[in-house]
Amino acid sequence: MKGLVIFFCLFYGCHVAGATGKTIMLFPQKTDTDYVTLKPTERVLNQITVCLKSYTELIKEHSLFSLAMQGSGKDNTLLIYPYPPNNISISIHNEDIYFKVDPEVLQWKRTCVTWDSKTGLLQLWINGKLYPRRITKSRSPIGPQISVILGQEQDSYGGSFDINQAFVGEMSDVNVWDYVLPPENIKAYFSDDYTLDGNFYSWDGGNYTINGLIVVLRNQFIPKL
């Protein structure tokens, strides 16, 4: 598999983990005013992969990644929403799909979600484990104009946050691709041997705006699984 990962890196971009420290965003308090807005390029997505790393003591539901489109009923175009200790909801075009997952433990969690609008195939990976695949009802693409928020759940385009859905903890390595990332590269993301840069949004090179009292910690290191 190592050879496949190196081949992927040559064409799609990545760097060896450990060469530089990680940028971590710390969400220190329960509030409806602290969040991060990601600013990817605007284009239509027929496929998507979202990968992120999170670390929290929360034992209640919370929003990690919220992608909304403009218009009625499009606030949960893609939502990653854990229900600790052992459930998570992935929403696609406001269809909530629930997964039973391994119980939460107090460690960094790696989460990847992939979706293909042509087939409706939805895949959830957590800490290297692929959970039973699902098929969504929607076959509509995502975009082109989207709002992407970390740490809050959008009930309208770009806002209408609920304090009871807020994330408290740390987040890092949020990357988005405009295709379904192959399993060998998802496993590489979990292994931390390589950091794969998203071609739609890259944590290391993407634009973002911090709102509220979020603390940016640079040159940090995240323990391996």
UniProtKB/Swiss-Prot annotation:
Superkingdom of this protein's organism: Eukaryota
Binding site for Ca(2+) 1: 75-76, 153-155
Subcellular location: Secreted
SUPFAM superfamilies in alphabetical order: Concanavalin A-like lectins/glucanases
Keyword Disulfide bond: yes
Disulfide cross-links: 51-112
UniProt-annotated glycosylation sites, renumbered to this chain: 87, 207
Positions contributing to Ca(2+) 2 binding: 153, 155, 165
Keyword Metal-binding: yes
Keyword set, alphabetical order: Calcium, Disulfide bond, Glycoprotein, Lectin, Metal-binding, Secreted, Signal
PTM annotation: Glycosylated.
Cofactor note: Binds 2 calcium ions per subunit.
Assembly and oligomerization: Homodecamer consisting of two homopentamer units. Pentraxin (or pentaxin) have a discoid arrangement of 5 non-covalently bound subunits.
Protein name: Jeltraxin
Source organism of this protein record: Lepidobatrachus laevis
